[in-house]
Amino acid sequence: MKLFSFNKLSLMFLIILFNFTSSEEKLNQIEIATLGAGCFWCVEAVFERIDGVIDVVSGYTGGKTKNPSYKEVISGKTGHVETAQISFDKTKISYDQILEIFWLSHDPTTLNRQGNDVGTQYRSAIFFHNLNQKNIAERSLKEKSNSKIFKNRIVTTIEKLDIFYEAENYHQDYFNNNPNAPYCQYIILPKLKKLNLIQN
């Protein structure tokens, strides 16, 4: 009976340890990228359709104002950028590949604007989480600048991530929740079609 109890406890311990280890391994597979490429509704809609991306959260970072509201950010006075924080499985997609999509999905040569969205809150920016991301971002920027893919000079900034403030709930999954909204129909949808992320 004692032997049985010991074996049962050992088995339970091994199961708990296995589950903990599996969860820890899964967490180690997840990396986060924080990018500014114009309106965060667009950035979110693009990356939500990329294989290997687990979650995308719209928010604000890069400024000094604490807990900014959308109204404050779009005033252009907070210094914050509309950004998307992208959680991805690095066994399926790399940070390098995330940046490739970033370059393709917006115009990194227009200073403080994307299309009709104008202001410092729409600036092109890569916010790195660690030294490895910083090095990859700098190399990627250099490669794109040297490749002359873009006619004009790239103005994307590479900045250390400080505090990321999650945007209000109504901004999250905006395209999915408001597919018929004018901005979605005339701005986001054409972008998704151009990138072959949605069927015509």
Task: Identify the function of each model-found stretch.
Residues 3-6, 20-200:
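Flexible coil/turn and secondary-structure edge motifs
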Residues 2-3, 14:
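N-terminal leader/targeting segments
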Residues 8-19:
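Bacterial N-terminal signal peptides
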